[in-house]
């Protein structure tokens, strides 16, 4: 944090003493302070160090083993500048293999950090990132095949903040941790003794791993002292399987200024902001009075995700206004998007996402046996019963020898790291048609090595705030089309990935490799 920002925030926290007595009591005692990840910049040699290790974190009254980058849980926000090369030295102090994927970065397959980029226990990997893409909020996380869900659940995730000349000219809020605030939202399930309770089994392979505790930057319902004016929130849905739907507790609007790959042409005003797993959106919200309010996530129509306490609006964080003013603004225009090129004559690739019917049926049965009808709130019951072969449900063996590890597929094939499915042409636009027809599950589909444009999303034109640069598209029982282009090489040994970002689907086969 720069000295002037530190001094200003120190003053801001001091001003909390000027709040009304009741407000001070709420601020001081009721909620933990929102943890702010360190903003990690390069050293004099243009290098950054990330150390992956295990530690201890406290959630409520219990302490759990967690994993983190440069700490016990989560990680720093790595700051990158467009046009400036950075070398990242990654040290793995875990007792198992891992990888580090740069989600949203347009970098060659050699440094993308997919499942082939293994860092052994006690090992080191160095990658040089030549950043040449617009300012954006991206992130990094493990991509160890078959274990991505568990390693993310244990705590491994960090932000990437890309800056360029264009964004620095805008008067957006930019005081890190004060009026420019990272918000990493994840749900967790804990065992009776307080440890993270991760399971990859038939049920989670079908619907994903989810929990009943929501963490924001690793804390339960924290609060943030915000100066008056515009507050910028960099939202990341870091959940394994839970989609979120952000809103405010007092219905003040959110102004979306950026999606996965950077700024929108102009702010988009919304009252609700659905965010899929792995997606990022930057929003501005006006803090223009003395009234505290909550950022909340509203109930979603996703299998298993309306189980209490998520059957009603659930607090993500409290925003507590303080008596000083910030200087950031909400510009009328933000950036320019290139016009979509002609789609005539482009290579068309068709990807059919599918789940083994046995997995569907067994997973849903186990979900309903564990959680009851609440697990299906908001779902189409007639469609579900058809999917589950309801008449046969009582004759299932609850797992037996069923191989759920390869039960999710793309174009009829479970992921094979040694067999890329196709070769994309470098520097050429392609039209990818991604279908979830015949499958009722939510599949946020993520493509490595590119930022694309959504042509249609689940059979409809994309919403205004989803029409900019994206690396993830919603596929849910329908067809989505995206316009992609790859500007870097990805040879067979370091192929790019395209996969469902519901991590348990990815870990059980719904992923493909492709070369450029």
From Swiss-Prot:
<feature type="binding site" description="type 2 copper site">
    <location>
        <position position="101"/>
    </location>
    <ligand>
        <name>Cu cation 1</name>
    </ligand>
</feature>
<feature type="binding site" description="type 1 copper site">
    <location>
        <position position="500"/>
    </location>
    <ligand>
        <name>Cu cation 4</name>
    </ligand>
</feature>
<feature type="binding site" description="type 1 copper site">
    <location>
        <position position="443"/>
    </location>
    <ligand>
        <name>Cu cation 4</name>
    </ligand>
</feature>
<dbReference type="InterPro" id="IPR011707">
    <property type="entry name" value="Cu-oxidase-like_N"/>
</dbReference>
<feature type="binding site" description="type 3 copper site">
    <location>
        <position position="501"/>
    </location>
    <ligand>
        <name>Cu cation 2</name>
    </ligand>
</feature>
<dbReference type="InterPro" id="IPR006311">
    <property type="entry name" value="TAT_signal"/>
</dbReference>
<dbReference type="Pfam" id="PF07732">
    <property type="entry name" value="Cu-oxidase_3"/>
</dbReference>
<dbReference type="GO" id="GO:0016491">
    <property type="term" value="F:oxidoreductase activity"/>
</dbReference>
<dbReference type="InterPro" id="IPR001117">
    <property type="entry name" value="Cu-oxidase_2nd"/>
</dbReference>
<keyword id="KW-0560">Oxidoreductase</keyword>
<comment type="subunit">
    <text>Monomer.</text>
</comment>
<dbReference type="GO" id="GO:0042597">
    <property type="term" value="C:periplasmic space"/>
</dbReference>
<keyword id="KW-0677">Repeat</keyword>
<dbReference type="GO" id="GO:0005507">
    <property type="term" value="F:copper ion binding"/>
</dbReference>
<keyword id="KW-0732">Signal</keyword>
<feature type="binding site" description="type 3 copper site">
    <location>
        <position position="143"/>
    </location>
    <ligand>
        <name>Cu cation 3</name>
    </ligand>
</feature>
<feature type="binding site" description="type 2 copper site">
    <location>
        <position position="446"/>
    </location>
    <ligand>
        <name>Cu cation 1</name>
    </ligand>
</feature>
<feature type="binding site" description="type 3 copper site">
    <location>
        <position position="103"/>
    </location>
    <ligand>
        <name>Cu cation 2</name>
    </ligand>
</feature>
<feature type="binding site" description="type 3 copper site">
    <location>
        <position position="499"/>
    </location>
    <ligand>
        <name>Cu cation 3</name>
    </ligand>
</feature>
<dbReference type="Pfam" id="PF00394">
    <property type="entry name" value="Cu-oxidase"/>
</dbReference>
<keyword id="KW-0479">Metal-binding</keyword>
<keyword id="KW-0574">Periplasm</keyword>
<dbReference type="InterPro" id="IPR002355">
    <property type="entry name" value="Cu_oxidase_Cu_BS"/>
</dbReference>
<comment type="function">
    <text>Multicopper oxidase involved in copper homeostasis and copper tolerance under aerobic conditions. Is responsible for the oxidation of Cu(+) to the less harmful Cu(2+) in the periplasm, thereby preventing Cu(+) from entering the cytoplasm.</text>
</comment>
<feature type="domain" description="Plastocyanin-like 1">
    <location>
        <begin position="55"/>
        <end position="165"/>
    </location>
</feature>
<feature type="binding site" description="type 3 copper site">
    <location>
        <position position="141"/>
    </location>
    <ligand>
        <name>Cu cation 2</name>
    </ligand>
</feature>
<dbReference type="InterPro" id="IPR011706">
    <property type="entry name" value="Cu-oxidase_C"/>
</dbReference>
<dbReference type="InterPro" id="IPR008972">
    <property type="entry name" value="Cupredoxin"/>
</dbReference>
<feature type="signal peptide" description="Tat-type signal">
    <location>
        <begin position="1"/>
        <end position="28"/>
    </location>
</feature>
<dbReference type="InterPro" id="IPR045087">
    <property type="entry name" value="Cu-oxidase_fam"/>
</dbReference>
<keyword id="KW-0186">Copper</keyword>
<dbReference type="Pfam" id="PF07731">
    <property type="entry name" value="Cu-oxidase_2"/>
</dbReference>
<feature type="domain" description="Plastocyanin-like 2">
    <location>
        <begin position="227"/>
        <end position="292"/>
    </location>
</feature>
<protein>
    <recommendedName>
        <fullName>Multicopper oxidase CueO</fullName>
        <ecNumber>1.16.3.4</ecNumber>
    </recommendedName>
</protein>
<feature type="binding site" description="type 1 copper site">
    <location>
        <position position="505"/>
    </location>
    <ligand>
        <name>Cu cation 4</name>
    </ligand>
</feature>
<feature type="binding site" description="type 3 copper site">
    <location>
        <position position="448"/>
    </location>
    <ligand>
        <name>Cu cation 3</name>
    </ligand>
</feature>
<comment type="similarity">
    <text>Belongs to the multicopper oxidase family.</text>
</comment>
<feature type="domain" description="Plastocyanin-like 3">
    <location>
        <begin position="399"/>
        <end position="516"/>
    </location>
</feature>
């Amino acid at each position: 944090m720069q000295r002037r920002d530190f001094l200003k925030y120190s003053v801001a926290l001091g001003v909390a003493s000027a709040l009304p007595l009741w407000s001070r009591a709420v601020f001081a005692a009721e909620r933990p302070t929102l943890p702010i990840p360190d903003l990690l910049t390069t050293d004099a040699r243009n290098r950054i160090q990330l150390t992956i290790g295990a530690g201890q974190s406290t959630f409520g009254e219990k302490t759990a083993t967690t994993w983190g980058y440069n700490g016990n849980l989560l990680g720093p926000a790595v700051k990158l500048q467009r046009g400036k090369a950075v070398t990242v030295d990654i040290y793995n102090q875990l007792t198992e293999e891992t990888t580090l994927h740069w989600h949203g970065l347009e970098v060659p397959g050699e440094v993308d950090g997919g499942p082939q980029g293994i860092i052994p226990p006690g090992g080191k990997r160095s990658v040089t990132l030549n950043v040449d893409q617009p300012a954006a909020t991206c992130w990094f996380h493990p991509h160890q095949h078959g274990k991505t869900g568990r390693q993310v659940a244990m705590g491994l995730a960090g932000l990437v903040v890309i800056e360029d000349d264009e964004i620095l000219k805008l008067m957006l809020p930019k005081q890190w941790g004060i009026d420019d605030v990272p918000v990493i939202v994840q749900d967790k399930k804990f065992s009776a003794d307080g440890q993270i309770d991760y399971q990859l089994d038939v049920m989670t392979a079908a619907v994903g791993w989810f929990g009943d505790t929501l963490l924001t930057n690793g804390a339960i319902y924290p609060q943030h002292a915000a100066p008056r004016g515009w507050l910028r929130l960099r939202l990341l849905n870091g959940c394994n399987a839970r989609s979120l739907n952000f809103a405010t507790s007092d219905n003040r609007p959110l102004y979306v200024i950026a999606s996965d790959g950077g700024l929108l042409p102009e702010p988009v005003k919304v009252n609700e902001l659905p965010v899929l797993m792995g997606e990022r959106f930057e929003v501005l919200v006006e803090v223009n009075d003395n009234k505290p309010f909550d950022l909340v996530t509203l109930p979603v129509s996703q299998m298993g995700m309306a189980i209490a306490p998520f059957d009603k609006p659930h607090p993500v964080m409290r925003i507590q206004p303080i008596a000083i003013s910030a200087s950031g603004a909400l510009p009328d225009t933000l950036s320019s998007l290139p016009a979509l090129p002609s789609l005539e004559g482009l290579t068309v690739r068709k990807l059919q996402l599918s789940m083994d019917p046995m997995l569907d049926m067994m997973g849903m049965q186990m979900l309903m046996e564990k959680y009851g009808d609440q697990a299906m709130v908001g779902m189409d019951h007639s469609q579900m019963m058809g999917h589950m072969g309801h008449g046969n449900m009582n004759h299932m063996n609850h797992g037996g020898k069923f191989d759920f590890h390869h039960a999710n597929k793309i174009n009829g094939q479970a992921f094979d790291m040694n067999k890329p499915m196709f070769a994309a042409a470098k520097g050429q636009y392609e039209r990818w048609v991604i279908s979830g027809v015949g499958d009722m599950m939510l599949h946020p589909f993520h493509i490595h090595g590119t930022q694309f444009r959504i042509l249609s999303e689940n059979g409809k034109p994309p919403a205004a705030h989803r029409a900019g640069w994206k690396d993830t598209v919603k596929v849910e029982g329908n067809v989505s089309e995206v316009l992609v282009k790859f500007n870097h090489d990805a040879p067979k040994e370091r192929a790019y990935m395209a996969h469902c970002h519901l991590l348990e689907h990815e870990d059980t086969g719904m992923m493909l490799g492709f070369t450029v």
